[in-house]
């Protein structure tokens, strides 16, 4: 995602402005974070499970009313993406995205199974 945004800024010769991105899936999110294995593969997941757990202590899928409507098991996934947000806006200056040295624009998959995701983004500026 981040490399595509940077390439679009260069291709359109836009030096300064903002990018806004949106993931069209209902159970994914866009954010900035340090893409470090412990954070990405453990800490974020544990934090989200503390807020809206997928399984109980016995390993059973926790029932959410969403499951009654769609007959699936990803009610907690919708809550996770709601908290993290499916969109992001970030400024760029001199053709570079303005994020910290350890930050990355990141798609966070919140669903209970793998999916292919589309990200729509716009670059606005001069």
Provide a role label for each language-model segment:
Residues 1-126:
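Active-site histidine-anchored catalytic micro-motif
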């Amino acid at each position: 995602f981040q490399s595509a945004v940077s390439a679009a800024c260069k291709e359109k010769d836009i030096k300064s402005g903002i990018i806004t991105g949106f993931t069209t899936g209902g159970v994914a999110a866009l954010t900035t974070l340090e893409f470090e294995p412990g954070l990405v593969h453990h800490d974020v997941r544990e934090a989200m499970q503390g807020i809206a757990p997928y399984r109980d202590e016995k390993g059973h899928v926790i029932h959410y009313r969403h499951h009654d409507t769609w007959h699936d098991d990803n009610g907690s996934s919708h809550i996770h993406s709601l908290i993290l947000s499916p969109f992001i806006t970030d400024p760029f200056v001199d053709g570079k995205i303005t994020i910290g040295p350890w930050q990355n624009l990141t798609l966070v998959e919140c669903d209970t199974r793998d999916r292919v995701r589309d990200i729509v983004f716009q670059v606005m500026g001069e």
